Amino acid sequence: MRLSLCALAGALVLSTLTACDPPGQPKAEELPAAQVTDFKVLYTENCSGCHGDNGQKGPGRILNDAVYLAVIPRETLKNVLIYGRAGTAMPAWAISEGGPLTPQQIDALVNGIEAWKKPVTTPPGAALPSYAETTPGDPVNGKRLFVRGCYACHGQGALIGPVTDPSYLSLVSNQNIRTSIIVGRLDLGMPNYRVLNAGHPLNDQDISDLVAYMVSLRPAEAAMENANTK
């Protein structure tokens, strides 16, 4: 009888233990905000509103794009998160710059975004363009390239919108224009640099020329302010 009571007591203890949630790490959403390093949580709460739920189809720069991630240096991507983009809607995110994120959280975002990288193949005889301008552009050749490859969608009166409009050019930096030409918006139907030269890829100089042409149309009062914004 005594053995039976002991066995019953043991069974009750065991059933009580198995009915409870096992101890373990708290979920990311249960951690204090400064301790969250889960990429999905950080991205959803801080980035998806502008850059889309999966790095695409947001109003801001597409991040989940093979060409973009192939050309932007890791250090540049990290600095954009830390310091933001002057003159744009991209704020500084690092605590050191007045933002909410710790260095560990910045690194978690950089690592998560870079995990979206995919192999990029370049057309025969072509190389990936440089993220930043390496040589000055020629606006005369840039205008020729614009008329041939961009005007149908982005000229005056075009349905998609004129990117040569002075108001638009007052708001964007030279680097913003360059990145948009290189990367495009495949998620929204805008091609990237590979087909903007009458169906052929633009080379690095072509891209600089296009930027130079568009910058030449920028209002004088905005030219100095935006020219050196990275």
Stretches with model-predicted labels:
Residues E29, V36, K40, G52-I82, ...:
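Gly/Gly-Pro-rich "capping" loops immediately C-terminal to redox-active cysteine motifs
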Residues M1-L8:
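Bacterial N-terminal signal peptides that target proteins for export
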Residues T44-C47, G60, G87, V147, ...:
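Disulfide-stabilized extracellular ectodomain repeats and their linkers
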